[in-house]
């Protein structure tokens, strides 16, 4: 959540369809504080699709006198959690934690053939092993795929 809340409009590259993740947001002694990410590999540039870019552009277009240095999401972690809980209740689905969205995103990419090394970089994991430890259960069909390749 901290990486998301630290994003500014300057971090978005509409031409190259990327977002630069280069800082983290925290509340320290009731103050909004921007810090460096946890690890060097947490600093990264990720590709995003047109849907994400259009949402950010709409936020820019509807903001009051926006500046590139403005936060894209000026809400609290608590507010995000509350809004997600409300959405889940309205949709009559089990409660989802914000981190579950990250996990679902990673699982979706991995199950659709995205290389584990690429995924690890996207997530900002310091070691690929971390990504493997969390997501290796997503690839149960890998043995079948291996057999298909070998049988060609």
Where on the chain are the PLM-derived regions?
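Short, basic (Lys/Arg/His-rich) helix/loop patches that form interaction surfaces
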Residues: 46, 54, 61-75, 81-121, ...
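Alpha-helix N-cap/helix-start motif at helix boundaries, enriched for small hydrophobics
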Residues: 2-7, 119
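DNA/chromatin major-groove-contacting recognition/catalytic segments
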Residues: 26, 30-36, 114, 133-152
